[in-house]
Amino acid sequence: MIDTHCHIIYGVDDGSRSLEESMKMVEIYLANGFTKTIATSHFDRSRYMVDPDEIREKAAILNAEIAKRSMDFKIYPGHEIQVEPNTVKLINDGSLNKLADSRYVLLELPFMNKALFLKDLIFNIQLEGLVPIIAHAERYAYVKENPDYLLDFIKMGALIQVNYSSIVSSQRTTRTLLERNMVHFLGTDAHQSEWRSPNIKDEKREIIDIIGEDKFKILSQTNPQKILDDEYIGSGYDQIKEAKKKKRSIFDFWRKK
């Protein structure tokens, strides 16, 4: 499997605190069936503005240590980009890493309030020949309230990543997105070896129960590998299923009064 979202680069954000902590994460990754991950350290002006070169340098150090220990694992550089109106400029001037030097960029949205400029931003990102991926879409309050919020962006060609762990913490929304074919990638969003670790064995089983082995392979292997190979991934907008209609209650009539 390939992880598309993690904070394995040490000493730069709220993720791993040391090289050895990162190596413990690699051990957990391997025990869970992963062989590759994209390091998506934060770029967020309110918290962490991790330098793109530092991500690359520390990824290289970690990969050298991985090889030294004869582990079958590789780390690729990336960024988790908190959206702002001038995100495209920051990408173009080299302040932000694309995922594994591909056409794909991972975007983090505000958690509580909608980014009113998001549609324009996605359009402008696409004008640059890039493909936006919305990180942990299930965690945003407005997506929990209305998963259809994502439909316009998927129709534009944006892709959706959800966290394995959210099948527990945001179960209803995650299940809805998975069942309706609105997800393109699974990610651990792993931060450390114990707190928010890459250990997703239980979550993996639950997700497979929902979408089946074949679809799980697409979200955890096929599509992530296409990022690494810089291959096109369609949004599959026409494959999205209608929302299930809520069961009506005998009391609904009186509620409308």
Language-model features: locations:
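Non-catalytic positions within long, well-ordered alpha-helices that form the structural scaffold/packing
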Residues: 30, 126, 178-179
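Extended substrate/RNA-proximal surfaces in nucleic-acid metabolism proteins
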Residues: 49-161, 239-257
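Short acidic, glycine/proline-enriched helix-loop-strand junctions
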Residues: 48-55, 69-74, 195-223
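Active-site beta-loop-alpha junctions enriched in small/polar residues
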Residues: 7-9, 13, 42-43, 78-82, ...
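Short acidic/histidine-rich active-site segments
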Residues: 182-198
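An N-terminally biased module of ancient metal coordination in phosphate/nucleic-acid-related enzymes
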Residues: 1-71
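A general structural detector for well-ordered alpha-helical segments in enzyme core domains, enriched
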Residues: 21-25, 54-62, 121, 149-150, ...
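Mid-to-C-terminal alpha-helical segments outside catalytic/metal-binding sites
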Residues: 205-257
